[in-house]
């Protein structure tokens, strides 16, 4: 089998895995294209709303924040003996390359659920406060906003979180969450508790469950703490997290005809992603750090 045929077969395998993969990150994060080495998000929280125009326009002065996401490089690559590929005709390596395609599509899940969420209690948001904190300043209004709790997941703590999100304000003191598309983000260990809270139509005694379907359950295996839980409002253009993409090369090959192949008789295949993930609007996320 010639090199071009092998490459086409592996490319097909890659996109079979990529297209079939299901992701969770896009439920809670906004994908933003990047055109430079880094992108500035100092405008978060200060997007002006429409007002009645009485004479001249009145440009809103935005709060000055410093929040920048620098792009990083990520890759996944394999080394294959050229002779093995020709003998195998991609049968053995097809599943491996499909797995790389799956990994390429789902990698932002690891960034969002494996890093941003659990570290939100110690990582800073655009306002210089911890992303999950008890005293986020609301612009220059003099008031503060808390999106952090410490109570275990139950009906009471869930409703504290839900009310907090619905009452969240932007820098101008106006509601951020004018609608609610709530997602309860949990580790696998809290699945039974979450299902009892949100998916049981009736309580154990037979009374109606007032929290029935008040939020969708999102279970992430990347969350390793067994007690912490999160409530996200996924409504709106700007979500609590940002996935920034500068460049994506789905499938690259270094094979027959290259100097590396001439010396070692080995082919190299891989995928490349340049980007990053960071924090968006903390007003749309609530985190419970349970002792």
For each predicted feature, which ranges?
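Assembly/oligomerization interface modules of large self-assembling protein complexes
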Residues: 16-74
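Peripheral peptide segments
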Residues: 20, 26, 60, 67-69, ...
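Long, hydrophobic/aromatic-enriched structural stretches that serve as scaffold segments
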Residues: 51-103
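Alpha-helical scaffold segments that mediate packing/assembly in large oligomeric complexes
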Residues: 88-91, 95, 102-164
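Residue-level signal for secondary-structure boundary elements
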Residues: 19-26, 33-36, 105, 112, ...
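Sequence/fold signature of self-assembling virion shell proteins
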Residues: 2-4, 134-174, 178-183, 189-291
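An acidic- and aromatic-residue-enriched active-site/binding cleft used to recognize and process polar
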Residues: 46, 66, 81-85, 105, ...
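N-terminal catalytic cores of peptidoglycan-degrading enzymes
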Residues: 1-38, 244-250, 254-257
């Amino acid at each position: 089998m010639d090199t071009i045929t092998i490459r086409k077969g592996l490319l097909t395998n890659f996109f079979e895995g990529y297209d079939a993969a299901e992701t969770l990150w896009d439920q809670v994060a906004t994908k933003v294209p990047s055109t430079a080495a880094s992108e500035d998000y100092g405008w978060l929280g200060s997007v002006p709303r429409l007002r009645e125009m009485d004479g001249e326009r009145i440009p809103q002065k935005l709060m000055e924040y410093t929040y920048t996401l620098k792009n990083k490089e990520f890759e996944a690559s394999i080394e294959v003996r050229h002779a093995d590929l020709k003998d195998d005709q991609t049968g053995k390596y097809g599943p491996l390359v499909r797995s790389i395609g799956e990994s390429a599509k789902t990698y932002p899940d690891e960034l969002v659920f494996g890093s941003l969420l659990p570290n939100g209690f110690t990582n800073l948001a655009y306002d210089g406060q911890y992303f999950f904190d008890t005293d986020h300043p609301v612009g220059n209004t003099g008031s503060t906003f808390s999106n952090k709790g410490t109570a275990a997941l139950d009906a009471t703590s869930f409703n504290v979180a839900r009310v907090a999100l619905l009452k969240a304000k932007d820098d101008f003191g106006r509601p951020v969450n004018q609608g609610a598309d709530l997602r309860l983000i949990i580790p696998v260990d809290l699945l039974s508790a979450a299902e009892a809270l949100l998916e049981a139509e009736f309580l154990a005694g037979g009374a109606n469950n007032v929290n029935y379907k008040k939020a969708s359950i999102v279970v992430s295996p990347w969350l390793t703490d067994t007690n912490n839980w999160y409530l996200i409002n996924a409504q709106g253009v700007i979500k609590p997290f940002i996935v920034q993409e500068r460049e994506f090369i789905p499938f690259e090959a270094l094979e027959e005809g290259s100097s590396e192949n001439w010396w070692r008789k080995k082919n190299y295949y891989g995928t490349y992603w340049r980007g990053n993930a960071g924090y968006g609007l903390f007003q749309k996320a609530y985190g419970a750090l349970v002792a």
